[in-house]
Amino acid sequence: MAYMTPYPVRPGGPEDIDFLWEMLYEATQHSSLSDPAISRYLNGWGRPGDAAVVALDPDDGQKIGAAWYRCYPSDDCGFGFVGAWIPEIAIAVVPNRRGSGVGRACLQKLVDTARSQGFEALSLSTRCDNHAAIRLYERHGFTRLSGTDSQQPSWTMKAGLSTIVARQ
C-alpha cells in the first residue's frame, strides 16, 4: 500500500532556490555554505538533470522540507557519489517538523521524479549518527556501501529505483 502523506509535495522551481539553500544548511548541520564541498550541491542550480521537490504545510502553505538531486562528474563529485549517471540526493526538513513524515513524503516524490526522468538508481551520503535518516533510507531500499574517515563518519548509500517502494 502506498504511503499517503498529509503534506502536499510539489516540484521545486527557480522560486525555491533560497529555500533549498536554507535546507542545505540544515542538511549539513550548519556547515559553511561557502565551502565548495558543500556549495556544489546547489551552485548553478537548474542544469540538466537537476530536480527538486518542496513539502508544504497543509494549513498555511509554508515550505517545511525539500529534497533534491543532481548528477556529478567523477572529477567534481559530492560526498555520496556512486557514478556519473546516478543522481545524489539531499533531504532536509525544518527543525520543528522533523520526525513527522515530511522527509518520507519528499523522498517518495523525488523517487517518482527520478523514475520519470529515466534514472535507475539514487545515492546519498548521511552521517553515521543520523539514525532517523538511516532508518528512513533503509526502509526505502537504500543499502550502505561505504563509510568515511573517523572525523566526520558518514555512510554512502544507494538504492535501485526498482527496489524503492513507498513505506508507511
Predicted regions and their residues:
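Short hydrophobic/aromatic beta-strand element in the GNAT-like acyltransferase core
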Residues: D50-V54, A66, A90, S123, ...
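C-terminal "cap" of GNAT-fold acetyltransferases
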Residues: G83-P87, E120-S123, R127-I134, E138-H140, ...
